[in-house]
Regions:
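Conserved donor-binding/catalytic core segment of Leloir-type glycosyltransferases
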Residues: 4, 175-199, 205-216
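N-terminal strand-loop element at the rim of the active site
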Residues: 5-67, 155, 218
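An amphipathic, basic-hydrophobic alpha-helix
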Residues: 49, 59-83, 93-101, 125
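Donor nucleotide-sugar binding/catalytic pocket of nucleotide-sugar-dependent glycosyltransferases
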Residues: 54, 131-170
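Acidic anion/phosphate-binding donor-loop and adjacent secondary structure
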Residues: 61-67, 142-146, 160-180, 197
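Short His-centered aromatic/hydrophobic patch
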Residues: 86-92, 114
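A conserved, positively charged/aromatic
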Residues: 104-138, 150-151
Length: 220
């Protein structure tokens, strides 16, 4: 069996990690795993597992991305995957528009995964257009059935996100020396944020500024 997964890029994030884990599992089970994306730093890790990456600019949130529909349909005709799995909205639209014009007798089966609570509009609705729709939790299933009532409930399956035991061992405890360094770095950062505040502002304002600074720190 050949399975093609489609997502914007392979840099970091839960969707990306899940894509790699599915591809790795498929290869270990003797199947062929393909991933279509704009690329990224996780491509090498994907290919190490034996999966194949196909670079295509399916990541841009613009109308220009519609020019990728024909090339993507050509790719489907060449690769002939058994399953086409869409994981994000922009590549989802590209893949869906390419797929729906293909011969129903020979085109791949379409699967989509709804990973979160997307904004409710026609743009997000593509994630419910799979012949089978995967919801990552019961809350997501409820979101789909409530916000997109036209979705046939029988085609929705709840498949919870798994955890790789080797990467998250149950009894793991970090070394005390590492914890001491980590805590010191965290408090040093928070102290630097608080010390920059105007002494006349309220505690609530300080907290808000700290939260904003934390967001900026995470972004960098």
């Amino acid at each position: 069996m050949k399975v093609m997964q489609v997502l914007p890029e392979l840099n970091s994030g839960g969707v990306e990690r899940g894509t790699l884990e599915v591809a790795d599992f498929l290869v270990k089970q003797g199947h062929e795993a393909l991933v279509v994306s704009n690329g990224g730093r996780l491509v090498a890790k994907l290919e190490e597992s034996g999966a194949r990456h196909i670079a295509m600019p399916v990541h841009r949130k613009s109308l220009g991305s519609l020019f990728q529909v024909r090339p993507f349909r050509k790719l489907l005709e060449q690769e002939k995957p058994d399953i086409l799995h869409i994981r994000s909205r922009v590549p989802g639209w590209i893949a869906y528009l390419a797929w729906r014009k293909m011969d129903k007798a020979t085109r791949p089966r379409l699967v989509s995964t709804v990973h979160g609570f997307y904004s409710v509009n026609r743009y997000s609705a593509v994630m419910t257009k799979g012949e089978r729709v995967i919801a990552v939790s019961e809350s997501i299933r409820e979101y789909i059935t409530t916000k997109y009532p036209a979705t046939v409930q029988e085609k929705i399956s709840v498949i919870h996100r798994g955890v790789e035991p080797s990467q998250f061992p149950r009894d793991f405890q970090p070394e005390p020396s590492w914890l001491e360094i980590w805590r010191g770095e965290q408090w040093e950062w928070w102290d630097s944020v608080i010390m920059r505040q105007d002494p006349c502002i309220t505690t609530g304002q300080i907290l808000l500024n700290c939260l904003c600074a934390a967001v900026e720190n995470e972004a960098t």
